[in-house]
Amino acid sequence: MSIKIKSMLILLILLTITLVFSDTFQRLKELYENTKTIKVSFVQKVKYEWYPKADVSKGIFYASKGGKVRIDYYSPDRVSIFVDRKKVVLVNFEEKVVYIESIKRNTSPVIASLFFLSEQPEKVFKPIGEFKEGDKTVLLLKPLKKDENVKEVKIYFSKDGEILGLKTYDAQGSEISINFIEVVRNYTPTDELFKPSIPEGFKVLRYE
C-alpha cells in the first residue's frame, strides 16, 4: 500500500470516528451527525523513523456520506485519489500513470473495520487518554486489533470542539500528521466530483 493511499485511508478513519468517548465531545458528535458533505484543505507531513526530513504535501479532501471520497494533492506533486467501497483509483499526473487497486487488497484491520465493514468506532478503538497541549484538547486512541499501519492516533480539537488535525503512528515509528487549514461542510458537490477519469495517454496499472 503506497504512502499516499495509506494517508488517505487515515483521513477516512478520522471522518468515520464519532469520538463520543466523553461528554467533552458531545457537541462534536452532533456536528458530525449533521454533516452530509465535507471539504478540508490540509497540510500533511510524513516523518520516517529512518529519515530526518519530513515529506510535506498539500491538498484538498472531499467526502460525502455514503462512501464517496476524493483527495487532490497539488504540492509537491499533482495526484488525485478516488475511493469507494470497491476500489481505490490513484491518478499521478507527473508520472502519467493511473493505479487501480481493489479494496480486497486492503491489509489494515482498522481500515477494514471502520470503512469497509462499517463497524462502530467504539468496537475498533479504545480511548487511552484525554489531555491538554496549550489551548488544544488531545484525544489519544489505540486500535483494539493489532495493525501495522495504525499503532495509535492523536486527534486535536480547538476549545470550541472543532477538529484541528491529527497525528498517527505506525509500528515502525513513522508519523503522519495532518493539519486542517479550512473546513467547509454541507456544500453541494458537482456530479463529476467523485467520478475518476483516465486522462488520454496515461498508463493504467490494475491490482485486483
Curated annotation (Swiss-Prot):
It holds the Pfam family LolA. SUPFAM superfamilies: Prokaryotic lipoproteins and lipoprotein localization factors. The keyword GTP-binding does not apply. It comes from the Bacteria. Residues 1-22 form the signal peptide. Keywords: Signal. CDD domains: LolA. This is Uncharacterized protein aq_1483. The lineage of its organism: Bacteria, Pseudomonadati, Aquificota, Aquificia, Aquificales.
